[in-house]
Amino acid sequence: MTVHATPEPAAHQGVALGSSFYAAMRILPRPQREAMFQVYSFCRFVDDIADSDRPREQRVAELQQWRDDIAALYRGAPPPRLADYQESLRTFGLKREDFEAIIDGMEMDVDADIRAPDEATLDLYCDRVASAVGRLSVRIFGLPEADGIELSHHLGRALQLTNILRDIDEDAGIGRLYLPSELLHKVGITATDPRVVAADSALPSVCAPLVERALAHFAAADKVMNRNPRRVVKAPRIMGKYYYSILQLLIARGFAAPRAPVKLGKASKIAILLQYAIV
């Protein structure tokens, strides 16, 4: 996508169609559904920029164009690709800083390939690329302010840590390593080459505390959802259960190399959807 590429407003649902969260978004009432498709579409476009193999300078420019477009949107003069976001901003009170935080997270991937970040940097990354998405989403779902912030904090981190644990080999293939340096050093891994780390026999000992951390975030997110009306949290509940199930598959598989890819099957997704979609 070039800097000036303009997705048509009607294409938001099509962009979201490939998401594992599509069904969770599709069951929402129309205004919420359309707003979630918009948020997902935005995330997908900036994420594709961050993950592309185009020169870094070009990707930086493309992300800056999105930042400029978000600024224009909040000035009331959106570019064509964000024109239909205005109604969602007014209806749900979506915050500019959350869109910008997502771009900040993508820039962390573009500025340099992330390799063994310290814990603080990893947590900041998770907040930007996952919890910021959650902060936009919980406003659309209709959660109270405090509970929404708490849910996005915990569920966002749970999902992103699960992503990191699932994608160790895929990330290594593009020169990235999101496992924190403190945990690597604790088990004697000093290499920062992602492929070398991915093949290290001590890797399961690095992953174990991240698994526990993700499980704790899932549990904290469940507590927030349990105290809110079922109709308000059905979409995040489905999203969380999808990823909790993936984490359980990862635990069952283990983290020693070689690792077989893990994917949640269609039947499991349907079962989760049927369990939580009907209020």
Swiss-Prot record:
One of its GO terms (biological process) is carotenoid biosynthetic process. It comes from the Bacteria. Transmembrane segments: none annotated. One of its GO terms (molecular function) is geranylgeranyl diphosphate synthase activity. The keyword Cell membrane does not apply. It catalyses: 2 (2E,6E)-farnesyl diphosphate = presqualene diphosphate + diphosphate. This is Presqualene diphosphate synthase. It comes from Rhodopseudomonas palustris (strain ATCC BAA-98 / CGA009). The lineage of its organism: Bacteria, Pseudomonadati, Pseudomonadota, Alphaproteobacteria, Hyphomicrobiales. The gene is hpnD.
